[in-house]
Design a protein with these regions (language model features):
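Membrane-embedded hydrophobic alpha-helical segments
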Residues: 1-39
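Amphipathic, membrane-active segments
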Residues: 33-82
Length: 157
């Protein structure tokens, strides 16, 4: 013990040992938290890839490539298959409505905008080839915004 206000060496050692134990405990807690966060991030990244890769790399580009106008100046019915692929992607991404509702709503809203655009364009007739190309570019742009949105969120994980 303390004699005459001085702390003995054994007490100093005990105090240092206690501080080291507390510090070591705090570091353990922090590393568990960081590891859990990393596991969640890795899991989310895995889900993004699992859900979106097939659409972004294959299905969507193939459907967009088929978009064209028929000889009467109407949007070819191939736009319907693009629309169903987009809706299928949103359905398969429903997992994110639970873990990242803001992202899911953004994806859903952008896909609905594309749907509305496709319906709008398909309801009109475009005789002029330049006008037809402008509309195809609008469709490609809307699809591009959806893919960019997905990629942006994937890279933020």
């Amino acid at each position: 013990g303390a004699v005459g206000g001085t702390i003995e060496l054994s007490d100093k050692i005990s105090l240092v040992a206690l501080m080291v134990a507390i510090l070591s405990f705090a570091i353990s807690i922090i590393s568990i938290y960081v590891q859990k966060k990393l596991n969640t991030i890795n899991l989310d990244a895995k889900y993004y890839e699992l859900i979106f890769n097939q659409f972004i790399l294959d299905k969507i580009p193939n459907k967009v490539a088929l978009i064209k106008f028929d000889s009467k100046g109407k949007l070819d019915s191939s736009y319907k298959s693009l629309n169903s692929v987009m809706m299928e992607m949103v359905r398969k991404a429903r997992y994110f409505s639970f873990v990242n509702p803001k992202f899911y709503k953004g994806l859903s809203d952008r896909t609905k905008k594309l749907d509305e655009l496709l319906v709008e364009i398909s309801s009109k007739t475009y005789i002029n080839i330049i006008e037809q190309n402008k509309e195809i570019i609008r469709i490609e742009d809307a699809v591009s915004k959806i893919i960019t949105y997905i990629n942006k969120h994937h890279s933020q994980i």
